[in-house]
UniProtKB/Swiss-Prot annotation:
Description of its domains: The Q motif is unique to and characteristic of the DEAD box family of RNA helicases and controls ATP binding and hydrolysis.
Reactions it catalyzes: ATP + H2O = ADP + phosphate + H(+)
Name of the molecule in the record: DEAD-box ATP-dependent RNA helicase 52B
Organism: Oryza sativa subsp. japonica (Rice)
Binding residue positions for ATP: 213-220
Domain Helicase ATP-binding: 200-384
Compositionally biased spans, kind Gly residues: 79-112, 567-583, 594-632
Similarity annotation: Belongs to the DEAD box helicase family. DDX3/DED1 subfamily.
Keyword line: ATP-binding, Helicase, Hydrolase, Nucleotide-binding, RNA-binding
Biased composition (Basic and acidic residues): 119-128, 584-593
Gene coding for it: PL10B
Domain Helicase C-terminal: 411-562
Length: 638
């Protein structure tokens, strides 16, 4: 049952259109909105004093100093403005913006608009991304404070290019601005990770950058910090608010919806209270809400290539003001066939050309295709290669078990029971189970749930809302088992995953490395278990070589399968070469000037190596050789 005050408000709303038609502008179109916590209270009888909340009756009487209010306290017009001049409110008569709306008028004070240059200040009503809520379960706790920094001490780093700025050992050494430094403190970032130590000073200096570092090593902050800091230092004059076209100053492209959302969430934390607005746009979600967000203003746009092309073709986004361009997981974009779209966005739209904008390209691996694309987009760039954190021996324990297809579910059940028994307070540790098919993911999820193991799944047939819900449920521990396919989980940063189980082994050793890299992140230890049987014989040799290089114990039966699969010669997709380099790529500008043939005869690290040459040494990544002595495999610990 509604209160008398709520009834009067409803009646006023129903009668307002007719009254407005009869009397023109002589009275308020409709009564002000009554917040739920004020409903059921009697309207104050006394007239409002200066600075007090006006009564409902007083609000209905228009005046020059206090215009009529549509929407009421939603825009903080009356509540924040006070009496006298009154806080102007959007939707009232236009005199309000001059009389009280901007903070003047008889001690009114600022309403939705304030006295700062540029009008609306987003910081006044910006949602706090640091607020404790269900959505923020593990977002901050332990991401940097939980990093095993000792594992970073011996990490190899290479840079190439002229006049490389020196690395920074602490965030205090970098001039990022007070507001951003405060957000870094609130994120509990103790000190920069290796990629941040080198990449942030390079970007702050205005240089283009190609950075090769594993996912989970702090790449998002490495490109977000310089972008936010740069926008804060040299913000252009505000554009007309009436335009339906958004003019972002920075564009961050990523290959998947989930990764775009992930980057957006992190960037919002970094940009909190800086006045820098971050908006995300991706497919699979209604475009109307994204358009509304863009119309409210945007400095940093995080987008997938497909949705961005849609916005550009609708003329709802213009790239002519872009000062910063960042591509995250660039190798994945090429894998997923985005190169034509990226080239069109960067080269054929209204984006400023290279040299007039700053471009940062981040990837876990840099084979020739990525570097060729990068050289088209970058001007006088610095190449940065950051090796893996420690060795797999220290971080990820790999186990391979021979399990027939018919026995996989029972074996999985045994693993989960043992894991639960050994877990803290009998709780299930976060476990990621990879399968090959979408149907298999759904079936395994239902089977686990019916057997007492809370599980959820993520794959390409899930709606965006379902995928986001599943990830939140998994990260929070509500459903500590996530069944996933490769494509759906690629690029996601899921902290605290203790165990990765390859229920179905992939056909490619690259995908195996992507999968097990979901654990052992940020210098922490992890466990990876794989179910192997006759159908996986083509993977036996590269899997055996991988485990040997990582100083893992290789079962004798797997060595026999490896010897059988390599009988009569090797080569092909899964053939790898040994070595010791530990990077995800090598600057191809160096290789062009050295012997060895093609791009990179002289060796490479993770995914490095030769393109047409004889293949070089490689740790995870081997001597990749397109047309040469067997392909190395990318170390995309992605």
């Amino acid at each position: 049952m509604r209160s008398s005050w709520a009834d009067s408000a409803a009646n006023a709303e129903e009668s307002a259109p007719a009254a407005a038609a009869n009397h023109g502008n002589s009275r308020l179109p409709r009564s002000s909105y009554v917040p739920p916590h004020l409903r059921g209270q009697a309207a104050p009888a006394a007239p409002a004093q200066a600075g007090a909340l006006p009564s409902a009756a007083a609000a209905a009487q228009p005046s020059v100093g206090q215009p009529g209010v549509v929407g009421g306290p939603r825009w903080a017009g009356i509540v924040n403005g006070g009496g006298g001049g009154g806080g102007g409110s959007v939707g009232g008569s236009r005199q309000g913006f001059g009389a009280g709306g901007r903070g003047g008028g008889g001690g009114g004070g600022g309403g939705a608009w304030n006295s700062r240059p540029g009008g609306w200040d987003r910081r006044d009503r910006e949602p706090d991304p640091f607020a404790n809520s269900e959505a923020a379960e593990v977002d901050f706790e332990g991401e940097n404070t939980g990093i095993n920094f000792e594992a970073y001490e011996d990490i190899p780093v290479e840079t190439s290019g002229h006049d490389v700025p020196p690395p920074a050992n602490t965030f205090a050494e970098i001039d990022l601005g007070d507001a951003l430094n405060e957000n870094i403190r609130r994120c509990k970032y103790v000190k920069p990770t290796p990629v941040q130590r080198y990449a942030i000073p390079i970007s702050i200096a205005g240089r283009d950058l190609m950075a090769c570092a594993q996912t989970g090593s702090g790449k998002t902050a490495a490109f977000c910090f310089p972008i936010i800091s740069g926008i804060m230092r040299s913000r252009p004059p505000p554009r007309s608010r009436g335009s339906r076209t958004a003019y972002p100053l920075a564009l961050i492209l990523s290959p998947t919806r989930e990764l775009s959302v992930q980057i957006h969430e992190e960037a919002r934390k970094f940009a909190y209270q800086t006045g820098v607005k971050v908006v995300v746009a991706y497919g699979g979600a209604p475009i109307t809400q994204q358009l509304r967000e863009l119309e409210r203003g945007v400095e940093i746009l995080v987008a997938t290539p497909g949705r961005l092309m849609d916005l550009l073709e609708r003329a709802r986004v213009s790239l002519q003001m872009i000062k910063y361009l960042a591509l995250d997981e660039a190798d994945r974009m090429l894998d997923m066939g985005f190169e034509p779209q990226i080239r069109k966005i960067v080269e054929q739209m209204d984006m400023p050309p290279r040299g007039e904008r700053q471009t940062m390209l981040f990837s876990a691996t840099f084979p020739k295709e990525i570097q060729r694309m990068a050289s088209d987009f970058l001007a006088d760039y610095i190449f940065l290669a950051v090796g893996r954190v420690g060795s797999s021996t220290d971080l990820i324990v790999q186990r391979v078990e021979f399990v027939l297809d018919a026995d996989k579910r029972s074996y999985l059940m045994d693993l989960l029971h043992a894991q639960r028994a050994n877990g803290t307070h009998g709780k299930q540790a976060l476990t990621l189970v990879f399968v090959e098919t979408k149907r298999g993911a759904d079936a395994l999820e239902n089977w686990l749930y019916n057997n007492g193991f809370p599980a959820t799944s993520i794959h390409g047939d899930r709606t965006q809302q379902e995928r986001e819900y599943a990830l939140r449920s998994f990260k929070s521990g509500a459903t500590p088992i996530l069944v996933a396919t490769d494509v759906a989980a690629r690029g996601l940063d899921i902290p605290h995953v203790a165990h990765v189980i390859n229920f179905d082994l992939p056909n490619d050793i690259d995908d195996y490395v992507h999968r097990i890299g979901r654990t052992g992140r940020a210098g922490k230890s992890g466990l990876a278990t794989a179910f192997f049987n006759e159908s996986n014989t083509p993977l036996a040799r590269p899997l055996s070589e991988l485990m040997q290089e990582a100083n893992q114990e290789v079962p004798q039966w797997l060595e026999r399968y490896a010897a059988r699969s390599s009988f009569g010669g090797g080569g092909g997709r899964n053939r790898r070469s040994g070595g010791g380099a530990r990077f995800g790529g090598r600057d191809f500008r160096r290789d062009r000037g050295s012997g060895g043939g093609g791009y990179g005869g002289g060796g490479g690290g993770y995914g490095g190596g030769g393109y047409g040459g004889g293949g070089g040494g490689g740790g995870y990544g081997g001597g990749s050789s397109y047309g040469g002595g067997g392909q190395g495999f990318s170390s995309a610990w992605d």
